[in-house]
Amino acid sequence: MSRIELGGVLGKTFGKVHHRLISRVSEAGVALAKTVPGFEQFMISSQRRGLTYSVFKGKKNIGVDDLGFPVTGDVIRIVPVIIGSKKAGVLQTILGAVLVAVGVVLNFTPWAAASPFFYKLGAAVMLGGVVQMLSPQPAGLASKQSSDNRASYAFGGVTNTAAQGYPVPLLYGRRRIGGAIISAGIYVEDQQ
């Protein structure tokens, strides 16, 4: 018997701990869908409500590739996660709220003329933090997986590597910075 723990709204709705006889991690959701009334419909409709799920085997968060592995006695935990949530941007949002609070406090001091500056700065920093939390950037070239994945200097830039999905900079005047190559091709021509 494998122990399956449900977290968050799943645990509140369907019970926190379940025991099922399963051989692979991927069978946990199927076993609960067949034996717990309403579980399958809840899982199907959860994406519309802005939820996705993380599966933990023991303390390790596993991916889709690891779901087919056999159960080795570890506890399987299924935890709901809000779609689009991540850790980046939380500190920025808190810093923005602090700046707005500083602006409110400055209203009652001799430096009241500076309070609109703190309101605007705090609101901009908060908005930037919220946008950063809701729209994650693609990993792309930030995650260097091999030693061959290095910056290229072939087209005259400082570093002209860019990942898919990033904006293309528009520059007027002389270029002294790295650039993003939109399209390039190299072909070999026989020389005789």
Curated annotation (Swiss-Prot):
Keywords associated with the record: Host cytoplasm, Late protein, Viral release from host cell, Viral tail assembly
Gene Ontology terms: biological process: viral tail assembly
Top-level division of the source organism's lineage: Viruses
Subcellular location: Host cytoplasm
One cellular component term from this protein's GO annotations in UniProt: host cell cytoplasm
Similarity annotation: Belongs to the lambda-like tail tip protein I family.
Function noted in UniProt: Plays a role in tail tip complex assembly. The tail tip complex is assembled successively with three tail tip proteins J, one tail tip protein I, one tail tip protein L and one tail tip protein K. The tail tip complex interacts with tail measure protein to initiate tail tube assembly. The formation of the tail tip complex is completed by the addition of tail tip protein M, which is followed by tail tube polymerization. May be excluded form tail tip during maturation and would be absent from virions.
Name of the protein: Tail tip assembly protein I
Lineage, uppermost ranks: Viruses, Duplodnaviria, Heunggongvirae, Uroviricota, Caudoviricetes
Primary gene name: gene 20
